[in-house]
Amino acid sequence: MKTQTVLAIGAHIGDAELTAGALLASCAVHGGKAVTLALTAGEKGAPAGADIAEYRRGKIAEAEAFAKELEGEAYVLDYEDGLLPDNDEVRFAVCDIIRKVKPDIIVTHHENSMHKDHIVCHRIVVDAWFYAAIEGFQRELPKHFAKKLYFAENWEDAPGFEPYVYVDVSDGYALWEKAIDHHWFAVH
């Protein structure tokens, strides 16, 4: 893999790390830049009885620890888990991060899912990818066209998903295993 910047975007912290984490780790091993963006913290997945605000802070720390392991970056937007708005405010927030990060590759959710936030995230990212590339959408940063936009699935996004790209991530797999262990869900 030539040195590239890969931006993996998920509806929740943990989504990108699971669906594209090994790709991000492989990118990092080869000198590229690995970046995650979560549109929500995924705080509604808190264990029974847990304080939601405290759990949210913990999830953000997990995202940062994962990114640090890859010498990358983690961004988390401040939208509520389960209630991700399907609007241009979110699309332009994602557009701005695309323009800031300047990825060669973006990976996000497949269009079908049992989780509404994953479906909305897919639509947001497709539009934000377009907005980021068009100079006519005046923003603080100049346009950037990410040459490749790929879709990944996890167990929630499998309906209708047909794999169409396979990447050898074996060089980064050990690093991904180490990084994913920073996530509570991976060790409990």
Show which residues each predicted segment covers.
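Metal-dependent de-N-acetylase/amidase catalytic core
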Residues: K2-I9, P85-H188
